Amino acid sequence: MDRKLLDRIRECPTLPSLPAVALKVLELTQSAEFDLTDVARLLSKDPALSSKILRTVNSSFYGNGHTVSTISQALVLLGSQAVRTLVIGFSLGSNLSKNKSGSFDRATYWRRAVYAATASRLICERMHLIQTETCFLAALLMDIGMLAMDQVLGEEYGAITARALSHGDLPAIEAQTLGLTHAQVAGMLAQQWKFPLALQVPMEHHHEPQEVKDSLPRQLTEIVALAGRCADVFVDKGPMWALADARRMALELLKIDEAGCDQLLKEVGQRTAELAPLFEVKIDPHTNYDTVIREANEKLLQISKEGAQETHQHERRRAPRIKKESDVFILPCLGGVVRQSVKVRLMDVSARGIGFTAEKPMEKGDQFIFQTKKADGTPMTLLYETVRCDKNAKGILSIGAELVCVLNDGKKPAPKLHAAGTAEKISKAVMN
């Protein structure tokens, strides 16, 4: 971690801070003996904030069924944790919107924030957890480090975010270029604002929940991580990987199949359309889950066709394999339909192929997508074709696959396998 850059961000005079009202509400609601009357009296001193809370409690997102006209009624109906969430969310949202730069796509940032917040609420409801408001706020604010880094670095950070094809690619690019990620900055800000640990931990570790050891914080972080991937399904320009990851993570966390995940994502899209106006966030009214999944499947079908063409155009050559063991994820290409991503154990790699072990068999000729990182942290997406699937002496499935082609990243044509330097670039990426 680059401590100098972190200190530079921490000491930035234009970095947004929590207003006095929000700080006091946070302090009051963390006390075991606080009085709702004190919170109501405090909020009444900020008419704009009170108005937003009343508008929210009367919205279809909360669906109370009757009109609430006073802050006291809203507090009783919503509860202290929900009010805390709204006060902090509205306060920071308002402050952060005041500082705008031309280098950073803040509209996409806020769209992702409200999609993730909605998803976290729905996930908590399915898990019957009482930490719904905590997860909602953590998901809403988990990427706040991006805004802080943009405030300090300006055009430099805008160029970094532009290199990420998906939000999931961003931490590797940030770490490689800056020595610091937006998640680490979010953790620093959460600590500086004296957020409870239940908020701090998910905000800091939402890209690496496996690093959290304690069970409850780990569970909350996994919820926020899944919520973020659900948001990427709607926000990423190419949602294929986000969709595959969301399905895999939903199966692991919620024990739901693809149909159950599809229902969750459809509801995320519908409910976010209700939440977004409350935070003054504009979302495309034509963006719905049915459209997203159709586009993702069309992209996968296109990839399969490109792979078939490339297979006939290049001569396969053997390349030296290097032993390399690590857990990775692949995306099977099955009939042009996006499925969940699958974790496999990478065993060896070369410029022309990979070997791995898996729990489920693959047929000869089956294709899959594997994404690795270049030296600068940006992704390289590769299409492979299975050439063998055998059981070893221990009964473990050992699978070998040959590289078919490098896939287009959507910004420039993909290099051909027979082009000069391509094999070397692939070797560096997969062996990194």
Predicted regions and their residues:
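N-terminal helix initiation/capping motif
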Residues: 1-2, 14-18, 273-349, 402-406, ...
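Conserved alpha-helical "signature site"
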Residues: 1-241
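Divalent metal-dependent phosphate-bond-processing catalytic cores, especially two-metal-ion Mg2+/Mn2+ enzymes
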Residues: 189-201, 220-314
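Short conserved beta-strand and strand-loop elements enriched in small hydrophobics
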Residues: 326-335, 365-380
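Short beta-strand-centered aromatic/proline hotspots
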Residues: 344, 382-389
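Short, solvent-exposed secondary-structure boundary/capping segments
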Residues: 355-358, 390-404
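Extended Gly/Ser/Thr-rich low-complexity repeat segments
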Residues: 365-375, 411-424
